[in-house]
UniProtKB/Swiss-Prot annotation:
Protein name, entry field: Ion-translocating oxidoreductase complex subunit C
Organism: Pectobacterium atrosepticum (strain SCRI 1043 / ATCC BAA-672)
Residue ranges, annotated region (Disordered): 539-564
Keywords carried by this UniProt record: 4Fe-4S, Cell inner membrane, Cell membrane, Electron transport, Iron, Iron-sulfur, Membrane, Metal-binding, Repeat, Translocase, Transport
Main localization of the protein described in the UniProt heading: membrane
């Protein structure tokens, strides 16, 4: 009984809720065999042609490349891209790519040389002798991605399905009304597709393999049945035509009866799905050693004179492909990449073909309905009835328009497959899929900002923790250093401080430096007085020479007369008499001398006058000489000259006797003595002036 029940369920087909039946236009392109096209003038290869980050560029401008040579490198979800032909790297710059936003992406521009030479290829004809990791790495380096639409890296997808996969589904449904790329590939390359499925079976070791195909492809069904022969490990399942039966979750439900939970992938229920085009690319990569450099693209639409399916090199500009189909750009402005339900209008015709590009639709004016104005939602619920994912399109529409991101997320916005069934049946002509795409992009941007903020916070917290650790380590080192200081170290520190204090004291004793005042006029009064005194001395010497012939020589000065006090008194008396004589004298020389020399007290340099003081001129000369010598001695003491200047006065005249006094040993004591002498001299001069008066 159980065996009979298993046989009854063996070929059973389930159905999914929702879906639509749009008019089919597949016959425009499905009846024409696959054909090769000429090489374009340049190839535009975007770095990102898959679901994941772009790879690292490994070529430079001006490099010569061969077909199949990697242009980028990457790991994990970062797939490399390869040169579609041999030629020269002409530029690496931003270029508009095949995306609904029309944004630019970094691309490599290659100018072909026309030789189309391959690089060295690595083949694994006996792939069963290789390890699974080796084959997965080879598929990754070949740049194999899902060709059914999403472009997920195949090696990463297979790596995630190594455990728990019971059913491998090969998707050949191709439910879009105009697209026939997989249909034509199954008709002409069924054997190679089956070889690719065998490689997948070797990698995954599933319990069963199901090949799903819609019943509107009779030629492809016949070709696959012929290629399968009498195989028992693979089963071909022909399903009813219904849009979108080619969706991953929908085909899983049709073939297995299992529903994929919200927010999950089919691997969560033990199912893994691959497209027939991906299976073909896997065979070419493993057995033939060819990286993914071309794919089948459908050229269809009534605006094309030669519709069909072509082998298009990745990076071929759309304009070049349309010319191969007989398309006139000046007559038809609109071109759709993809099908009429899930495709998008191209902003430019210079965008390149990428790994997920399966169709170029150039409709005529009769094929396109006039653009209808968007109306308000009437809550008819037709969109909910047509949704194959079991969502509430009306609620998602309101949440998207109201920027209610969390509510849209809670209502499973990201489970929407963007099939366009809701917009197709909407009587208000609301472009629901556009709202959903925009809302998804905004939520992804918010999530990325939140991730960056969280990462920045983690980095900030790590930095603060590191700074705290470094601070604690420094404090610990300082404490350990302070605790480990020995007595000898302290003595050395004290000795260094004592040397610094002694040096500062010595600098203070030397005195402050002489201050130089800019633009100041020098005081030459002392020099003028000295010259005048010298002239007076010369004249007096001449007079004394004449008098010395008549008078007796002067006696030597006794030691008692060398007393500084007596000398100071004598000098003061001489100055008083000199003033009086100067007032009465009419000689200009004596007046200039007495006015130029300031009244300063004499230093303790003893100049003893031993002659008679009746002559006023001699007294004035003697007083001038005493003042000059006193000024010189004072200047020498102020400038701290080490060697004192000895004062020697030669007198040949008998009335004046000059005695040289020894210089004091200590300059400070000499200065003090000089000051005392000046004070006493002033007092004595005042007393003598009072007596004379």
């Amino acid at each position: 009984m159980l065996k009979l029940f298993s046989a009854f369920r063996k070929d059973r087909i389930w159905d999914f809720d929702g879906g639509i039946h749009p008019p089919e236009m597949k016959t425009q392109s499905s009846q024409t065999p696959l054909r090769q096209i000429s090489l374009p003038e340049q190839f535009i290869i975007p770095l990102k042609q898959h679901l994941g980050p772009e790879g690292e560029i490994c070529v430079s401008v001006g490099d010569k490349v061969l077909r199949g040579q990697p242009l980028t490198r990457g790991k994990g979800r970062t797939l490399p891209v390869h040169a579609p032909t041999s030629g020269t790297v002409n530029a690496i710059r931003q270029h508009t790519t095949a995306h609904p936003s029309g944004l630019s992406e970094l691309s490599i521009i290659i100018v072909p040389d026309g030789e189309d030479r391959w690089c060295e290829r690595l083949t694994y004809r006996d792939y069963r002798a290789q390890s699974v990791d080796t084959l997965l790495a080879h598929l990754h380096q070949a740049g194999i991605a899902g060709l059914g639409g999403a472009g997920f890296p195949t090696a990463a997808k297979l790596q995630g399905g190594m455990r728990g996969i019971e059913t491998l589904i090969i998707n050949g449904a191709e439910c879009e009304p105009y697209i026939t790329a997989d249909d034509r590939l199954m008709q002409e390359c069924a054997d190679e597709i089956i070889q690719g499925v065998e490689i997948l079976s070797f990698l995954l070791q599933p319990k069963r393999i199901l090949i799903g195909i819609e019943d509107n492809k009779p030629e492809a069904i016949s070709a696959l049945r012929l290629a399968l022969g009498k195989r028992s490990d693979m089963q071909l399942r022909v399903i009813p035509t219904k849009y979108p039966s080619g969706g991953a979750k929908q085909l899983t439900k049709i073939l297995t009866g299992k529903e994929v939970p919200f927010g999950k992938h089919s691997a969560a229920i033990g199912v893994l799905m691959q497209n027939v085009g991906t299976a073909y690319a896997i065979k070419r990569a493993v057995i033939d050693g060819e990286p993914l450099t071309e794919r089948v693209v459908t050229l269809t639409g009534e605006a094309l004179r030669q519709p069909g399916n072509v082998w298009a090199r990745l990076g071929t500009p759309v304009r070049h492909l349309l010319k191969q189909g007989g398309f006139h750009v000046t007559k038809q402005p609109m071109v759709v990449m993809g099908g009429p339900l899930m495709g998008f209008t191209l902003p430019l015709l210079d965008v390149p073909i990428v790994k997920i590009s399966n169709c170029l639709l150039a409709p005529s004016h009769s094929e396109m309905e006039p653009v209808a104005e968007e109306q308000s939602c009437i809550r008819c619920s037709k969109c909910a009835d047509a949704c194959p994912a079991g969502l509430l399109p009306q609620q998602l529409y309101w949440f998207s328009r109201g920027q209610e991101h969390e509510k849209a997320r809670d209502h499973h916005l990201f489970d929407c497959i963007e099939c366009g069934a809701c917009a197709y049946v909407c009587p208000s002509n609301i472009p629901l899929v556009q709202y959903y795409r925009q809302e998804k992009a905004e939520i992804r941007a918010i999530d990325e900002d939140a991730q960056r903020a969280a990462l920045a916070k983690v980095r900030f917290d790590a930095k603060q923790a590191r700074l705290e650790r470094e601070k604690a380590a420094r404090e610990l080192r300082h404490k350990q250093a302070a605790a480990g200081v020995s007595t000898s170290d302290k003595d050395a520190v004290q000795a260094a401080l004592e040397r610094v204090r002694r040096k500062q004291t010595a600098e203070a004793e030397i005195g402050s430096p002489i201050t130089v005042i800019p633009d100041a006029q020098p005081d030459n009064s002392a020099a003028i007085a000295a010259r005048a005194a010298h002239k007076a001395l010369v004249r007096e010497e001449r007079v004394r020479e004449k008098q010395s012939q008549q008078e007796t020589p002067a006696t030597e000065v006794t030691p008692e007369e060398l007393d500084p006090r007596k000398a100071a008194v004598a000098a003061a008396l001489a100055r008083v008499k000199a003033r009086k004589a100067a007032q009465q004298s009419e000689l200009n020389t004596t007046e200039s001398v007495s006015s130029a020399i300031p009244d300063t007290a004499a230093e303790p340099i003893a100049v003893v006058e031993a002659q008679e003081q009746e002559d006023p001129r001699k007294a004035a000369v003697a007083a001038a000489i005493a003042r000059v010598k006193a000024r010189k001695a004072a200047q020498q003491l102020v400038t701290n000259v080490e060697a004192a200047v000895p004062v020697v006065t030669e007198t040949t005249a008998e009335p004046i006797a000059v005695v040289e006094v020894q210089e004091p040993e200590d300059p400070r004591k000499a200065a003090v003595a000089a000051a005392i002498a000046r004070v006493k001299a002033r007092k004595a001069a005042q007393a003598s002036s009072y007596q004379e008066e």
